[in-house]
Amino acid sequence: MANFPRSAKRNLNENDTNFSLAKEYEELLRKIEKTKTILHTSGNVEVGITPHEVVQETRAYKLTHYRPMLSKTARTPILIVYALINKSYILDLQVDKSWIHSLVSQGFDVYLINWKSPTQYDKYTSFDDYVNVYIDDCIEYIRSKKIIDQVTLHGYCMGATMSAMYCSLHQEKVKNLATIAPVIDSSRDTTVLANFSRHLDAERMFSTVGNMPKEQLYSCYSALKPFKQGVNKYLNLVENIDNDSFVQNFLRIEKWLYDTPDIAGETFRQWISDIYQHNLLYKNEMKIGDHLIDLSKITIPFLNIVAEEDHLVSPECSAALNDCVSSTDKRLLRFHTGHVGLIASSYSQNNVLPKVGQWFRTRS
């Protein structure tokens, strides 16, 4: 580590401003060196901390089960459908900020779909496969295992959109639908991501590269907030490098940000073309396979959770789902946080999850 020159130190009085600056300079260098060392070992950070077991596995997904932590449990199990972007352990990053740990500690029987990264053999995998095959298979497993007729379907982001699609076609198997930040009405989405998606040639990308590469996905999301993602977060890390709790949380988030799978080419094409560019889902004109998605057919109890400061999905884009469904028992919850803060923060634990848990409890 570089040090302030000793010859210069000898000429400084401890009361001098220059002496104070020298000490601050040395302290900054120490923190930078410590930061470099920690970042080089960041891959060892632990995630996915709540006890669980894989109960079903295919080439497309792993179905994970989290047992409730209370002797008295809710009757209806919850199936969480995560997005196809990034990895699902953001929902279980660390105990004090874990969405899943909070649910199981409240007595809920929770299942989670962990999507696998597609290979080039999977580039023709579409929403028809994800919704009518993979999600349906998971629900059938739970119904058979628990000897029940219905589950609570709980989706996040892209997974919330797919959950709504599923309920429009198969709601006889779903008791309640709860969505977090779904992409529904793209005409109301004013984010940079939505604007970028409107100008993307998804057809050409699919025909050229097949699956959407994870490297391009990461670059795209990082570019949405370039100063924050490229500079500011590392300055904050240096400033807080002696705070172990801050550092561990930073490393877990960083691991998740870089851990991005590819997206199946046909699914990505539909996502961009049908939903963002032509707004077919909101218009009830989107087809997956031979099935027309009509969101107005959803009549089951419905909870929609949106983030007012979401920079990935505008809150009004998500809130539109409340107008689409025909449920008489429906509720929209708005929270002053961001896309990730909604599910993986102290704010979420204190403000979001108590209300979500209460909603589940009274309908399970």
Predicted regions and their residues:
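N-terminal targeting or regulatory segments adjacent to alpha/beta-hydrolase or S9 domains
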Residues: 1-48
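Alpha/beta-hydrolase-fold enzymes
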Residues: 1-21, 144, 148, 162-266
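Short, surface-exposed "cap/lid" segments of acyl-processing enzymes
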Residues: 41, 48-119
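Alpha/beta-hydrolase active-site loop
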Residues: 124-145
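Gly/Ala-rich beta-loop-alpha elbow adjacent to hydrolase catalytic centers
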Residues: 154-159, 163
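Short alpha-helix in the alpha/beta-hydrolase fold that links the catalytic acid
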Residues: 288, 300, 314-323
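Short beta-strand/loop motif that positions the catalytic acidic residue
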Residues: 298, 304-306, 310
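Catalytic histidine-centered segment of alpha/beta-hydrolase-like enzymes
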Residues: 312-315, 332, 336-351
